[in-house]
Structure formats: structure tokens, C-alpha cells
Curated annotation (Swiss-Prot):
Domain of life, per lineage: Eukaryota
Designated name of the protein: EID1-like F-box protein 3
GO biological process terms, semicolon-separated: abscisic acid-activated signaling pathway; regulation of seed germination; response to abscisic acid; response to osmotic stress; response to salt stress; response to water deprivation; vegetative to reproductive phase transition of meristem
Disulfide pairings: none
Cellular component per GO, a single term: nucleus
InterPro entries with a match to the protein in the record: EID1-like (IPR040267)
Domain F-box per the UniProt entry, residue ranges: 29-81
Length: 272
């Protein structure tokens, strides 16, 4: 899946799945110039793995798409968030990751926007966009886990603030990712409660089916506190690959609260 951006070749509607061109099998014979994989890696290292350029390159042809899927998305993730990737992938950052490296890259850099769901009403959808900077923290992740699931590892972003269309309220859009979701206590709880997968909502990062944590009654009160939202003013989903996305109504902070707000410790997270 390609990431969205300002380039026309990667534009999409945020409520639709992004689709990569089907990658072709690359022959074993060597390639010269920009199609050489080592050359591509060196080029991206020289530009600090610029996400917009990578999106453009990956959309040029099936060959470039295949190289991006096999090498470039993973190298981008490792380069931009080494600690987070090490925690998510274990001892083998060169191996596979649930949902694929392209989905993790999109989650790192792209705010998916928001739209109305069963438990969260918006007068108009809010478009997704590239996030200039995102901070992911496993400390934040604990606030989104029920008490009996606190051993799970979940990296969460800070909410991305949007002005709600047609109103004065501020919309918060947030995202996160679990480590080894298939083995997690959170998934075990969902299965034990026989929570149904949503019919109309899909993961904006991998396109997988999702559970509503609100419908499953697995949203702890601490999640609203962490987001700066009122209780009941949020909804979030977790997909079968462990990607989390959600929306909330943000409570405006007074100037005194902003000045005295506690800064989170970044030692357990990654600024991307």
C-alpha cells in the first residue's frame, strides 16, 4: 500500500484502501543506475529517507514498487524509529512484521483523518494528511490497555488536532501499533468476548478488518484522560494485524494548564 501525500500519483480518499501495484518478480540479474537496489538505498540514506520521495519512487513502476516492499519501507522504519522497530520486531528487524513494513511506515507518517462511526458522530469527514512530526510512546500505550492486558506492548501516538468542520470543537485523531498482536492479551479478550469484526470500517494502514474497542467494552477510562478527552467522547479500533486508529473530542486546555502541563518522558518512545 502506498502512503498518501500531495503527489497526484499517491492521492486517495481516506476512507478507501490504498493499493500498491502488484509487484513483479525481480530477476536475479544485476541492474544498473537507479534500479540497482544498493544505489536506491544510498540515495535514500543521502536524503534521510524522505517519505515523500519514497512514495513517489514506489509509484513509478512495478519494479520500484517491489523494491520498496522488499527493502525500502523496512529500511525507512528502522532508520526513522530504530528503538520502536526493535521493540516491535524483536531480535530480527530484517524479518517480517504483522501487516507488512509498508503499513507500519504509513502508520508512522500518516494521520488517517476521521469519519462518523457507530459510536462517534462527525458532521463531515476530516481528511488524512502526512504528519510533520509524530511521537510514539509505549507509556502512552498503557493508558489504552484494560488492566488485564497491561503486559501487552502498544506504541501510541499523541493525538493529531483537527478543527471540526462546521463546529467549534477540536477533533483528535490518534494511531498506534501492538507488538505480536496475535499473541496479545487484548486479542485474547476480544476473542473470549466473541467481539464481532466491523462490517463497514477497515484499517486505514493495512486494509485489514477491525474490532471496535468501544463495542467490545474494552476502552479504559485512562484512555480519555491520556488524550485530554471527555469520557465517552472517543472511539478506536484495532485491526487483525494490531494497528490501532481512533478519534476523540479534545477538551480545550486553559493557558494555565498548558503552561503547567507535564512533559512526557521520550525515553520509551520515538519522535518521527
Amino acid at each position: 500500500m502506498l502512503l498518501e501525500g500531495r503527489f497526484s500519483v499517491v492521492q486517495m480518499n481516506t476512507n478507501r484502501r490504498l493499493k500498491f501495484n502488484q509487484p513483479s518478480r525481480l530477476p536475479n540479474s544485476g541492474k544498473s543506475g537507479i534500479e540497482n537496489e544498493r544505489v536506491l538505498v544510498l540515495v535514500f540514506e543521502s536524503i534521510s529517507w524522505d517519505i515523500h520521495t519514497l512514495c513517489t519512487i514506489a509509484s513509478l513502476s512495478r519494479r520500484f514498487c517491489a523494491i520498496a516492499r522488499r527493502i525500502l519501507w523496512r529500511r525507512l522504519c528502522v532508520n526513522r524509529a530504530p528503538g520502536m522497530v526493535a521493540a516491535l520486531s524483536g531480535e530480527d528487524p530484517s524479518g517480517r512484521i504483522d501487516g507488512g513494513w509498508h503499513a507500519l511506515a504509513k502508520l508512522m507518517f500518516f494521520c488517517g483523518g476521521g469519519e462518523s462511526t457507530r459510536y462517534f458522530n462527525l458532521s463531515q469527514p476530516t481528511s488524512g494528511h502526512f504528519a510533520c512530526e509524530s511521537r510514539f510512546s509505549k507509556t502512552s500505550g498503557r493508558f489504552f490497555l484494560p488492566k488485564n492486558c497491561r503486559r501487552d506492548l502498544l506504541y501510541m501516538s499523541d493525538p493529531c488536532e483537527h478543527q471540526a468542520v462546521g463546529g467549534d470543537e477540536h477533533l483528535g485523531v490518534f494511531r498506534g501499533v501492538f507488538r505480536e498482536f496475535m499473541r496479545s492479551k487484548t486479542r485474547e479478550c476480544l476473542v473470549r468476548r466473541q467481539a464481532a469484526l466491523e462490517e463497514k470500517v477497515r484499517c486505514p494502514y493495512c486494509g485489514g478488518r477491525v474490532w471496535s474497542m468501544t463495542a467490545a467494552r474494552l476502552v479504559p477510562k485512562s484512555a480519555a484522560r491520556r488524550l485530554g478527552s471527555r469520557e465517552g467522547g472517543l472511539e478506536f479500533f484495532v485491526c487483525v494485524n494490531g494497528h490501532l486508529h481512533g478519534t476523540c473530542w479534545l477538551i480545550p486546555l486553559s493557558s494555565e494548564e498548558e503552561d503547567n502541563g507535564e512533559d512526557d518522558d521520550n525515553s520509551d518512545g520515538s519522535v518521527i
